């Protein structure tokens, strides 16, 4: 690569390979490197090379060798785990600046680390898989046309969005209709693109016509081909003037909806009602609902009182067992005692399962060993400012550890996923009993276990429902977020994942959760809580002219500054405002629990994020460019591009 034929168009440091999930404490399992996009002659290459301790990147480029095959993450490298996602590590931001020398073709590897270096032509890429949004560093996995996977690239200092933006100059990246985190790679060639779409059967209509429309107006065509939308959303679907390359493209008639659309008329909401919260339920008031034999009476009224005012702190230890399904509302006091004895025996039988596993057995059980390691790391960082958990030898930490490992025995398919310790901590703090806390936690997980499933379908559905509610409540706010590439509401991901655990002070979390557990006034009050927070910050977001980076930063800075009573009051007011609308769309009624889902008349293509294109390229959820992940944040900030794009 000499002279003018070689040009680096993108370069990013802090891109690591995680070579062994099981040996995460070994520094050699994390290989720091630099990722580059390089133009050479008429081709474009993606290079990754490790950075040696001296600060110089290893000078080696991977050259595809048909006799050796593509680099793989399967049998050739049994300890490599492309899905390994480290937890919320706090690391130094002071790093030596590597010397970014030009890669030299054919250089010999200088160490074992240099053997991981690779180079691949962009034309050889088949797909790019992006990590799910969560509480860890983002990574990308690239798959070649030959079917092999390159080592996963973990961006410890952010940059996935910037890299994808650069790749979109040379490739068309379309989100798979089966998996929104998988980007299918197509060449910048209309005939090849048409062929690819035809074989994938992504469109009901003639693929050549769709590709023509896609190249002329990618923003609108993407939505019209992949999504069920409404004329309610049309303001958000119009491309920017500079985004369409053909000014003569005929507009779609308003009265002729395209196939696959669900047309719903825009509705006018009435005035938002005034709502006042009630005082908490006291122990004296609770006792008035206790009838003969210790059975609770008039349970719907009692639940409504809890929804309206919450519970006094001294009552939570007993009441939470009912709210979380550990104790039955209809059972007598004697039946409760028998139930607790039965559940206590069941708990300790499950606990004995992992307690009796020897160290040698655990070494041969990588799944259990992985769960234990992850739990130990998470427990050591959970609510350590709370006196119940502070200190290195605090018994509360041991209880957290034991309950979470026992839950792995109870629900082995799900096991342990980062974030679960955040859900258990307040429960254990309140009930202060190992067995009771376990079964209450199981009840909570029955409500939210879908949030932690690998497919992330539940989280994607909830974000879609949140977006629909927000469009009905505040279309201008949605238009503003769309204009700032924040319309996916990815900054709300952590809110929904762990039910606002990190957004409110600890006592407010207790109040919020007990209100949500009542199931009133409908099944998705937590979505209205998210709408309420956005509604409270509406003017700040819009009038300040925030861009996408500032929006993410502002949302992160709301942590511990919100008032739970104000948020709950506004969420209930939003619910009443929506339910008072006589023409509320049916899909919104479903979210609020006012209507049953309709049986689909014909299969519809799943909602999918729009493909990337050179003219207008909305990218996956924004992540940071230079900000190190912090323990209390799953969001990253991406600085503005130097070219102002």
From Swiss-Prot:
Lineage: superkingdom: Eukaryota
Annotated segments matching region Required for interaction with OPTN: 217-309
A Gene Ontology cellular-component term: cytosol
Main location: cytoplasm
Phosphothreonine modifications at: 615
Gene Ontology MF terms: GTPase activator activity
Coiled-coil boundaries: none
PROSITE patterns: TBC_RABGAP
UniProt region (Disordered), positions on chain: 57-85, 596-645
Protein localization: Cytoplasmic vesicle, Autophagosome; Cytoplasm; Recycling endosome
Keywords from the named record: Autophagy, Cytoplasm, Cytoplasmic vesicle, Endosome, GTPase activation, Phosphoprotein, Protein transport, Transport
Annotated site residue numbers, Glutamine finger: 418
Modified residues (Phosphoserine): 602, 604, 608
Residue(s) at site: Arginine finger: 377
Pfam family of the protein (one): RabGAP-TBC
Free-text comment on this protein's domains from its UniProt entry: The arginine and glutamine fingers are critical for the GTPase-activating mechanism, they pull out Rab's 'switch 2' glutamine and insert in Rab's active site.
Subunit structure, as described in the record: Interacts with OPTN; this interaction mediates TBC1D17 transient association with Rab8.
Biological role stated in the UniProt entry: Probable GTPase-activating protein that inhibits RAB8A/B function. Reduces Rab8 recruitment to tubules emanating from the endocytic recycling compartment (ERC) and inhibits Rab8-mediated endocytic trafficking, such as that of transferrin receptor (TfR). Involved in regulation of autophagy.
Full protein name: TBC1 domain family member 17
Organism: Mus musculus (Mouse)
Organism lineage string: Eukaryota, Metazoa, Chordata, Craniata, Vertebrata
């Amino acid at each position: 690569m000499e002279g003018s034929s070689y040009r680096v168009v993108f370069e990013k440091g802090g891109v690591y390979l995680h070579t062994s999930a099981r040996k995460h404490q070994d520094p050699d399992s994390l290989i720091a490197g630099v990722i580059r996009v390089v133009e050479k002659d008429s081709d474009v290459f993606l290079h990754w090379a490790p950075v040696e301790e001296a600060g110089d990147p290893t000078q080696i480029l991977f050259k595809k060798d048909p006799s050796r095959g593509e680099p793989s993450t399967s049998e050739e490298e049994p300890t490599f785990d492309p899905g390994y996602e480290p937890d919320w590590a706090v690391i130094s931001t002071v790093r030596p600046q590597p010397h970014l020398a030009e890669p030299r073709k054919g250089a010999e590897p200088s160490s074992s680390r240099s053997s991981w270096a690779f180079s691949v032509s962009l034309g050889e890429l088949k797909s790019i898989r992006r990590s799910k949004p969560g509480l860890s560093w983002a990574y990308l996995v690239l798959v070649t046309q030959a079917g092999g996977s390159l080592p996963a690239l973990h961006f410890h200092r952010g940059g996935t969005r910037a890299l994808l933006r650069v790749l979109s100059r040379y490739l068309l990246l379309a989100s798979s209709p089966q998996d929104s985190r998988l980007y299918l790679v197509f060449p910048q060639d209309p005939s090849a693109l048409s062929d690819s779409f035809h074989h994938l059967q992504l469109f009901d209509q003639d693929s050549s016509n769709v590709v023509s429309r896609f190249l002329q107006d990618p923003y609108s065509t993407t939505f019209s081909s992949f999504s069920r939308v409404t004329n309610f959303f049309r303001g958000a679907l119009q491309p920017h003037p500079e985004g369409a390359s053909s000014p003569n493209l005929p507009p779609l008639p308003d009265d002729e909806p395209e196939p696959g659309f669900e047309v719903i008329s825009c509705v006018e909401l009435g005035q938002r009602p005034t709502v006042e919260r009630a005082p908490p339920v006291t122990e004296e008031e609770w006792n008035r609902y206790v009838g003969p034999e210790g059975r609770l009476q008039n349970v719907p009224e009692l639940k409504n009182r809890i929804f309206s005012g919450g519970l006094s702190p001294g009552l939570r230890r007993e009441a939470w067992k009912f709210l979380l399904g550990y104790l039955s509302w209809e059972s007598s006091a004697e039946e409760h005692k028998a139930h607790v004895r039965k559940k206590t025996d069941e708990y300790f039988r499950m606990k004995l399962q992992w307690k009796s596993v020897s160290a040698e057995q655990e070494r041969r059980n990588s799944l259990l060993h992985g769960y234990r390691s992850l739990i130990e790391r998470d427990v050591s960082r959970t609510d350590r400012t709370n006196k119940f958990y502070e200190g290195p030898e605090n018994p509360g930490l041991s209880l957290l550890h034991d309950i979470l490992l026992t839950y792995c025995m109870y629900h082995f398919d799900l096991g342990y996923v980062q974030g679960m310790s955040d859900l258990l901590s307040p429960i254990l703090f309140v009930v202060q009993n190992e067995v009771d806390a376990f079964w209450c936690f199981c009840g909570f997980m029955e409500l939210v276990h879908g949030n932690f499933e690998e497919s992330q379908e539940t989280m994607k559905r909830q974000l879609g429902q949140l977006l629909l509610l927000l469009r009905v409540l505040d279309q201008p706010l949605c238009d503003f977020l769309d204009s700032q590439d924040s319309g996916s509401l990815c900054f709300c991901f952590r809110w929904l994942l762990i039910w606002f655990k990190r957004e409110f002070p600890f006592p407010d979390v207790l109040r919020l959760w007990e209100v949500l557990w009542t199931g009133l006034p409908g099944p998705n009050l937590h979505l209205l809580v998210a709408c309420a927070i956005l509604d409270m910050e509406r003017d700040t977001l819009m009038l300040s002219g925030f861009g996408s980076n500032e929006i993410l930063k502002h949302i992160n800075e709301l942590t511990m500054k919100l008032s739970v009573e104000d948020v709950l009051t506004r969420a209930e007011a939003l619910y009443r405002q929506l339910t008072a609308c006589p023409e509320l769309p049916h899909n919104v009624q479903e979210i609020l629990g006012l209507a049953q889902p309709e049986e689909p008349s014909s299969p519809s293509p799943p909602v999918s994020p729009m493909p990337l294109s050179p003219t207008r390229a909305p990218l996956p959820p924004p992540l940071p460019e230079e900000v190190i992940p912090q323990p209390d944040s799953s969001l990253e900030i991406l600085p503005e591009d130097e070219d102002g794009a």
